[in-house]
């Protein structure tokens, strides 16, 4: 299922933060493998589903079970990096960079023009 770029980016950020916590808590865990095959546990579920961005833009994700969130993460990884070189590894970091770039493009091409139009129409109403 496709979600807004900001929601997917938030999910990747929450998962990345959790992988960093796990790597610091347990030095036997490989940071590289955590970036390629992240652990999605209840801590990720609680942080993500309670976040205000999720409540605002994807409220259907607030009631997810752990298995469903794990499936969402697997789906994001399976989609990969559209438009990137084939030899680019799919990791939490490369995915986050990819979705960050998509979100910036979305803001520049869609959201900012809408805001500009609203401001211009509001300014026109005042005169």
Swiss-Prot record:
Keywords: Activator, Chromatin regulator, Nucleus, Transcription, Transcription regulation
InterPro entries tied to this protein: SWR1_Swc7
Family the entry assigns: Belongs to the SWC7 family.
GO cellular component, one term: Swr1 complex
Cross-referenced Pfam families: SWC7
Main location per the UniProt record: nucleus
GO BP terms in the entry: chromatin remodeling
Cellular location(s): Nucleus
Official protein name in the record: SWR1-complex protein 7
Role description: Component of the SWR1 complex which mediates the ATP-dependent exchange of histone H2A for the H2A variant HZT1 leading to transcriptional regulation of selected genes by chromatin remodeling.
Transmembrane segments: none
Subunit text: Component of the SWR1 chromatin remodeling complex.
């Amino acid at each position: 299922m496709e979600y807004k770029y900001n929601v997917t980016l938030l999910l990747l950020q929450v998962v990345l933060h959790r992988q960093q916590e796990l790597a610091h808590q347990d030095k036997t865990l490989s940071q590289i493998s955590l970036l390629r095959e992240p652990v999605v546990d209840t801590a990720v579920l609680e942080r993500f589903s309670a976040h205000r961005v999720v409540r605002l833009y994807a409220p259907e994700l607030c009631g997810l079970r752990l298995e469903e969130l794990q499936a969402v993460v697997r789906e994001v990884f399976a989609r990969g990096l559209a438009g990137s070189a084939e030899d680019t590894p799919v990791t939490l970091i490369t995915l986050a960079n990819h979705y960050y770039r998509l979100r910036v493009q979305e803001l520049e091409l869609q959201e900012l023009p809408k805001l500009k139009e609203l401001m211009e129409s509001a300014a026109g109403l005042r005169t």
